[in-house]
């Protein structure tokens, strides 16, 4: 009987201690500069293999992860795939992300060249987001700054790619994932450049709109670089299309006279910002153009372009 008096308090202490340790482990911070990248978990990976991948690619303590995954009973539930960890803040988030059933996830594909509003419409259909809140966030300067982007809005920075997102992701979560993917791909491919990131993305968005074929992007880029170097108007049709209420099959002179800072028929230099979300090929082309003397180009009936060094030659190609 005397022993029983000590057993119950001891068990109570052990229970509370266990709860405390569990809570401490689940809320253990998981955050570092590398969380914005994608990491692939291979099919049939063991807990040990996954823990090593997380420790090698992210700042995750492999031993703490192994304890957490086993304590939650999820050591057999890790799902393979390509993950972005930007929304992960603690060990609980990490375990949930890696063990959530794919039925709780939605696969989305954002194609190159979509405008911000078109991305929002697409996400509303696929994920039932609050489209107004999403767009508001994309224009929220403090939120944009927190993402590491120096721009007035996120036009051009919602990276076109295929994503596997949890259904319960908030609008902020989705934006963070897309911008993180942009930054990762940009920093992996673009070294120091005479243009700023914002200028490169802005030019890339024009190239993305102009080019149907990737192999023409760097040559198209050279035309714009040559015109910028000569202080010529860019006269880029996509910048005019961007400011019109609806896209025109053919631009008329009256369209090119619309007074707007994005209109490169009226204002020299690059427009204030991107006009769509360019893909990595267009971004690379904007940063590293071909070397040429071309100043003009026009599309033929197959979507290819004819390039010229003189306006006279350009007019001839347009006929």
Residue ranges and their predicted role:
Residues 15-19, 36-43, 102, 233-251:
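Short N-terminal secondary-structure initiator segments
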Residues 20-186:
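Signal peptide-directed extracytoplasmic domains
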């Amino acid at each position: 009987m005397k022993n029983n008096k000590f057993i119950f308090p001891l068990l109570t202490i052990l229970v509370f201690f266990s709860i405390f340790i569990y809570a401490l482990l689940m809320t253990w911070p998981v955050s570092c500069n590398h969380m914005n990248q994608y990491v692939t978990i291979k099919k049939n990976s063991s807990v040990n293999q996954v823990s090593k991948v997380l420790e090698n690619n992210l700042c995750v303590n492999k031993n703490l992860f192994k304890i957490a995954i086993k304590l939650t009973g999820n050591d057999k539930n890790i799902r393979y795939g390509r993950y972005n960890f930007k929304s992960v803040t603690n060990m609980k988030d990490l375990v949930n992300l890696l063990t959530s059933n794919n039925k709780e996830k939605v696969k989305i594909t954002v194609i190159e060249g979509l405008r911000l509003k078109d991305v929002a419409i697409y996400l509303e259909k696929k994920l039932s987001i609050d489209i107004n809140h999403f767009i508001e966030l994309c224009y929220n300067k403090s939120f944009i700054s927190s993402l590491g982007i120096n721009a007035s809005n996120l036009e051009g920075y919602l990276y076109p790619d295929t994503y596997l997102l949890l259904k319960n992701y908030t609008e902020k979560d989705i934006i963070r994932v897309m911008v993180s993917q942009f930054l990762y791909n940009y920093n992996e491919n673009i070294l120091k450049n005479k243009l700023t990131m914002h200028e490169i993305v802005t030019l890339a968005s024009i190239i993305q709109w102009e080019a149907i074929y990737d192999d023409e992007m760097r040559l198209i880029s050279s035309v714009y670089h040559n015109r910028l170097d000569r202080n010529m108007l860019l006269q880029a049709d996509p910048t005019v299309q961007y400011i019109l209420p609806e896209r025109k099959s053919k631009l008329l002179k009256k369209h090119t006279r619309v007074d707007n800072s994005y209109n490169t028929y009226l204002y020299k230099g690059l427009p204030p910002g991107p006009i769509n979300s360019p893909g990595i090929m267009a971004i690379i082309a904007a940063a590293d153009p071909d070397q040429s003397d071309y100043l003009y180009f026009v599309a033929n009936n197959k979507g290819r372009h004819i390039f010229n060094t003189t306006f006279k030659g350009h007019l001839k190609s347009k006929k």
